[in-house]
Design a protein with these regions (language model features):
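Structural motif
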Residues: 121-130
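Short loop/turn segments immediately following beta-strands, especially the blade-tip
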Residues: 134-142
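Short aromatic loop motif centered on NTY/YTY
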Residues: 141-171
């Protein structure tokens, strides 16, 4: 009887531990973080706007909503670890879920937010900032693995190429 109770307790402990391990390693999706994004970081879109965009993309529909300024905003890309929203003609936001080097084994993630400003392809400017998954801004860019660094640099390069194309068109 005593042995049965010990086996039962041990088995219960193992099951609870396995369940907690699975929960800790559950994949965080950028759509979940976008849904939880504080209004103060993107005041032109309400929480309902963000939810609608995610739902529209999941349904294969055009993810366009009327924003708080009376204009149109559209989510143009959504994957498990990245999304892009054309907030207005002058602002596009790209969110990337990246892994800092010191968190590779733990699986902790950081949000990279790239705001690209400009209406003319030849005059685009990007500002990059980093946030914890609780949306607390980080003071500096964390050291990232090569793959994530290349993803961010590719977006920066895209801005430079658009700038170059705009200059060439004008001549």
């Amino acid at each position: 009887m005593l042995l049965d109770k010990m086996i039962h307790k041990t088995l219960l402990t193992v099951i609870l531990f396995c369940g907690m391990t699975v929960m800790c390693h559950a994949q965080i999706k950028i759509s979940d973080l976008f849904r939880e994004m504080p209004d103060s970081l993107l005041p032109v879109l309400s929480e309902n706007n963000r939810l609608d965009m995610i739902d529209f993309m999941a349904s294969g529909m055009k993810a366009e909503v009327s924003n708080r300024l009376g204009g149109k905003s559209e989510m143009t890309m959504l994957t498990d670890d990245s999304l892009r929203v054309k907030v207005s003609d002058a602002l596009t936001i790209t969110l990337l879920l990246v892994t800092p080097l010191d968190s590779i084994e733990s699986g902790n993630k950081v949000i990279c937010c790239i705001r690209t400003y400009g209406t003319d392809e030849s005059m685009l400017q990007s500002v990059t900032s980093f946030y914890t998954i609780q949306w607390n801004q980080m003071n500096q860019m964390p050291p990232l693995n090569d793959e994530d660094t290349q993803r961010i640099q590719a977006l920066d390069m895209q801005t430079i190429l658009n700038w170059g194309r705009g200059i060439l068109k004008k001549d």
